[in-house]
Amino acid sequence: MIKDKKIFDISKIFDAYSENNKATIVAFGSSVVERTIEGMHWFDCLEIALNWNRGRIHQCINSGHSGDNSRDLLTRFDRDVAPLKPNITFIKIGGNDTKPDINMSRSEFKSNMKKLVRKLKDIESEICQMTYHSPISKLYGKQRVEKLSEFMESIREVASSEGTYLIDDLPNWEILREKYPKVHKSLIHDEIHLSKLGNIFLGLSLIKTLNLNMGERDQAYWSKAMRIHTLLHSDTTKSK
């Protein structure tokens, strides 16, 4: 689900780039961004889909770091992101900000996100803020789930006020969590981190949002994630 009016032309974000003028694309965040052992990562899906659809017009750099919260992203921005001079930056953060010992208020989280956005604007990067996927509530804890929801609303507000792109997947994940709990659980391997299937599903959702297609020869690889995507969107169509 996409809510900021600027998002309606998000598929054009890659139009300025070619094999002779490549885009540097950075994913910035915590462990839900960081590459893990599970296999195909959601950011890999974007890289591969871009190559299928546009050719090698890009280089993708993963700057995820396990355990980070929004304060940490601000701290390491000048070291880990600014030198890369990204043309496009995807930010996914907020889970660790909900930890009780972090003592992060909603106002501080929103302020941190605004600062990150302005830092990226200063280096002339296009910005795609992403909301989270839904955790396993019983494992994550009611208070953290509620706080995560509040923080994601702050991300929506910052995207609107600062004019960034917003990729708002959380409402779709909430449908899976509430109506299809077994499916939802198959996408998460602990309380919050994505399984291999979860990464492929998130990647599929992302490339569809960006109006990119899957390679025909790889349809079988995407089949399980595609069935979940079809289930989800047939459900949302019925509810309208």
Language model features: what each stretch is:
Residues 45-52, 56, 69-240:
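Alpha-helical cap/lid subdomain in secreted, periplasmic
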Residues 1-66, 71, 76-85:
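Serine-esterase "nucleophile elbow" of acetyl-processing enzymes
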